[in-house]
């Protein structure tokens, strides 16, 4: 009698194991999908927290600060902007409001009399055109304000605005133009244009590749 009880108990245990295994292997498909989606959402959230409004190129996530650092690395001591603009200062100077962009980076020199500037606006898709117009007007205003200052005027006239995907970039660089000042205004403009082209080359490469 005891042996029969043991055999019965063993059969019950074995059946229980098979039932549990079957339930585990046969989870409803929608539950499996939901579990997978929850994992993916958690992973995406972790990625977004790793950087400040990053965008993704083929090499991974890149922030606007990393874009700036790439330009600084190429230009070296010829990159003079050093003070970040706040969103309020950006709006005051350019008319670009917070609702037009995802993120921005804007740097200028400490003294307003010195005009080396770089602005990168990650524009919202619906506002790319407005941001472009605002920066074109900003550029025209700087040219007008510096008509009586030859070296600054050359930098302003050499400035460039270029749109790369949803990134609207404004570069007004050149650093020390006195090294070509004795060759005339055309030489100073050409010198600054070359520095701006170098900066835009880096930005385009980082954003698109």
Describe these PLM feature segments.
Residues 2-10, 121:
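Bacterial N-terminal signal peptides that target proteins for export
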Residues 2-5, 17, 106-107, 155-156:
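A generic local structural motif
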Residues 11-16:
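Hydrophobic helical h-region of N-terminal Sec-dependent signal peptides
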Residues 24-117, 123-209:
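Soluble, non-membrane globular domain cores that form compact, hydrophobic packing
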Residues 19-22:
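C-terminal motif of bacterial Sec signal peptides marking the signal peptidase cleavage site
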